[in-house]
Amino acid sequence: MATDQLIHDLYAEIVKIPLIDPHSHIDPHRPTARTLDDILGYHYYTELAHSAGMDKALLADAPPRERVRSLLAHMDRFDNTVQYGWFLEIARTFLGFTGERLSAADADALWDAAERVFARPDWESEVMRRSNLEKVFLTNDFDDPLTKFDTSRYVPCLRTDDLVFRLDDPQVRQRLARATGEEGRDQVSLQRAVRRLFEHFTAHGAKACAISLPPDFVPSASGPGVFWMLAEHCREFNLPFDLMIGVNRCVYRNGVTQGQDLFDQRTSLIQYAELFNAFPEVTFCVSVLTSAQNQELASYSWIFPNVVTSGHWWYSNIPAYIEQDARARLQAVPKTKQLGYYSDMYKLEFGLPKYNMYRRVLAKVLADDFVRAGAMTEGGAVELARLLLRDNARRIFRV
Amino acid sequence: MATDQLIHDLYAEIVKIPLIDPHSHIDPHRPTARTLDDILGYHYYTELAHSAGMDKALLADAPPRERVRSLLAHMDRFDNTVQYGWFLEIARTFLGFTGERLSAADADALWDAAERVFARPDWESEVMRRSNLEKVFLTNDFDDPLTKFDTSRYVPCLRTDDLVFRLDDPQVRQRLARATGEEGRDQVSLQRAVRRLFEHFTAHGAKACAISLPPDFVPSASGPGVFWMLAEHCREFNLPFDLMIGVNRCVYRNGVTQGQDLFDQRTSLIQYAELFNAFPEVTFCVSVLTSAQNQELASYSWIFPNVVTSGHWWYSNIPAYIEQDARARLQAVPKTKQLGYYSDMYKLEFGLPKYNMYRRVLAKVLADDFVRAGAMTEGGAVELARLLLRDNARRIFRV
Amino acid sequence: MATDQLIHDLYAEIVKIPLIDPHSHIDPHRPTARTLDDILGYHYYTELAHSAGMDKALLADAPPRERVRSLLAHMDRFDNTVQYGWFLEIARTFLGFTGERLSAADADALWDAAERVFARPDWESEVMRRSNLEKVFLTNDFDDPLTKFDTSRYVPCLRTDDLVFRLDDPQVRQRLARATGEEGRDQVSLQRAVRRLFEHFTAHGAKACAISLPPDFVPSASGPGVFWMLAEHCREFNLPFDLMIGVNRCVYRNGVTQGQDLFDQRTSLIQYAELFNAFPEVTFCVSVLTSAQNQELASYSWIFPNVVTSGHWWYSNIPAYIEQDARARLQAVPKTKQLGYYSDMYKLEFGLPKYNMYRRVLAKVLADDFVRAGAMTEGGAVELARLLLRDNARRIFRV
């Protein structure tokens, strides 16, 4: 940073923008970590440690404090990764860590610091404030009661993977019946069930519907598809539909929890052309998994009024791909149609390092491609960042 | 620019190279804009404005002056894009605009300036001179009479999409019959028709045959394909064949005119292996739509003597992709086999900003990858640029 | 280099790391060039010259000294390429060339210098020393006797393309029968043959099994596949399995020798999911041909403990793709699971310029993404480079 004053200055302004985080997995009843294990239990650490040779038994069966020590002991195998960088930033910013590198020798001090810090009565608000997070979208199961949390801070979002891909599962049927009074065994019952879910969610402040989709998924109006029905209800209930396109579940069958999913690069947004044409009133906030498909996303969003670029997802959420993908979007997609970033986090503490990673890349792209190229003033670049990090989300999701 | 002296110096030399523009949609009888509506009617502006929320009615039915005002009013939604940058450069260079950003408030002044400037008797020559354009290739319908224009300045090129993809259309049949005296209903008649078209075009100075192709197109020697017949005539008549690979037409069905086409990234040049093998005497000037397929293009051009890289097309025609794609080509493809850029323009005024965009990227790549890396002198880098912008086109198209 | 002190300093340290080169085509009985024709006969030069218009007859039938002169005469058509850069570096470093550019006028002087230099009795050791090469892996035919060379310097590797793809060829059958006493006409005989090959190779110091695979290959446990059998023997004999994924053979049918192969970008590592799951004990060192598939590779290696990233192969072995691909791997894949580079060379003289190309890119990425970003000290960055260039290969291949 220090080597480039313009990037430094832009970054300093960008971090002041209060964030609307349009996609996370936060549990609003337990939004922050309680122990260091809640931090290092994040699948990025368990899967990287396992991938680098750590035995699954050490990960699964150990008591939390020992699991953390083992993870720290394995970190020297993946301390090159950005995910390690996120944790280092958490340790430094929130836990007072002052060393250069983390190792098993830091386990006790970090554990104790975490216990102390995370137990503060105002910890949740402090994390929000220090991370400059204003609103955080959730990912709620369809049968979530959505009660007992502040929906102006934690914005509900109807996650629909179970409805589209697991409705054959008796447990899912039962959950649907309990939530809606409908078993959804025929089109009429299914229609009624979905309608009740949308009524329930919008009554409780939901601002989006969301789903993750495998690479070979092709939405279609023909056949008894739940997916198409969801799009119809998004239209009726005025909800944007988050499409997270491209993930194959359980590719590595013996992987750690949440560390089993991968993808097939051979997928195309052309599979969604019929959908985008059929629902001009629905805003589709699209995430893709690969940088190659990002070129499709930038192009489809440049052409379709109802297609919006959304964040930098999972395997594309590293600076090498964020930089290339964000550059293309900023050069080709109307600035009002870009949701710059979302955290995808499970615990609030990750908002800060993840957004900082994005904001550093964004400052660099704005400096190189816009301010230095003479296309924008510094002030103009910061206003553009404000759209990406805040104002577009407010307008698109009506929050 | 100013921040990097070497890039600045290279750019200053590169802009002095007189351009051969090997692909445009210029109407030689009306090559320049007559009103500002001819500029802002370019599909890049109508599609971006529509994508950013502008009603199609405002675009289709409004009187030209009002349409321009509406477009300018919507520009603050896409003033981050390079296409906005092209227009800003036109306004500054040709229309005397001196402000920072364009808005509806500039509509009258720009309209009047355009009316005044575009009406100058020497405007066509002035644009050519100030843009440093020497020759501009056209894209002519097969039944274009090719008369009453200077074919040494505007080089005819036989566009063959209609013949390959729309020969079932009675109107196309009629046009073919009128142009050639043949209806093309059997192989013999079709052969005669195609031969007459090639005779007509080459007699009128045509220097290339061109076509755009969908992602799933696979040329084949078997079956009664017009495409294969065209390649045979390119061989016989000594014409390079421009292949623009990868576009799906009318994906966004309700899009504005020319703002409906997109693509499927899942396409490969392996589909053209049989063609490239069958016609070693024909030079294929290949454009691709995606940066991922650019790696295929660079590799196929590195191996096949008759495959030449051509320009940066459409959704790849933004600096983020031009830079990566040009770098790969410059590092891997013989320098004599690269057509650096073409304008794809409908009005001459766009030559300047589009080529400037390319020349800025080219200066940067030459500075970073060649001059600073010690692989070339500044003079050598400028000579390389001269091949890309001028000399390769002259040799390959024999102009 | 000189323009950036940090990159310069990192590079200076990185070149001191003794190299383990995990993949080459060196003939251990004739590891160095004997004439300049051995250098310029490398397919990169013959295919680029041919692609740029050089007649195959000049390449195939000419006496060596004339062929070299002709190649040099054509070099001004591809002196922009990195491959030209490798040769220029060889000429300067080993042959005393002091000029700016190479041409036919240099043919005699270079030929004579090469004759003199390559004939030195200690030339092989001198090249190894000046290139800082410690061990070089070979690519041995399955019936290679593996005798009369120093297997601690030249590490045998069982190349299995013939077994998997050409077992129907009577010549291959015969070679198999001679090498193993088995014709491999049924599963039992084939099992025995493969076992004997593994016994022979491991007894002679082989440290890997390797194969190159077409884009549509899908390994499967069902059916009488030799490939699956090889993986089983890798498990039993404790050998890593190098998978070089994505090449189509003989795409350009009239190309020069080894200058005929290309690829289809439409391939995915999902095709290997069953394999990776079935053999957790086998380390798969995976090379891919495209930068788009590199994102898959980085992701699969991040998740699967037994998938390791390996080098920058063929059409991806140019700085534009090395930089992007290496950045992604360094940000996302545990550092212990990356084989940074291999030479793929046929003559030892190419180790120096090829590794230097990689080391320059690596120094730049380490400077920009790690040291300047504050994520690593300079010393830490050099230690990371040591893993990529040496220590990971030693651990993974047990050398």
Task: Describe the residue ranges of each PLM region.
Chain A
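Metal-cofactor-binding active-site regions of metalloenzymes
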Residues: 2-237, 282, 298-399
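Electropositive, surface-exposed helix/loop patches at the edges of structured domains
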Residues: 276-292
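Short, flexible active-site loops
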Residues: 253-256, 280-285, 309-311
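A general structural motif
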Residues: 261-271, 288-295, 318-322
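Generic beta-strand/beta-sheet core signal
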Residues: 212, 242-248, 287-289, 310-312, ...
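Extended hydrophobic/aromatic segments used for targeting, binding, or gating
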Residues: 148, 158-171, 253-277
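Acidic, glycine-rich loop-and-beta core segments that form the ion-binding/anion-interacting portion
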Residues: 208, 214-271
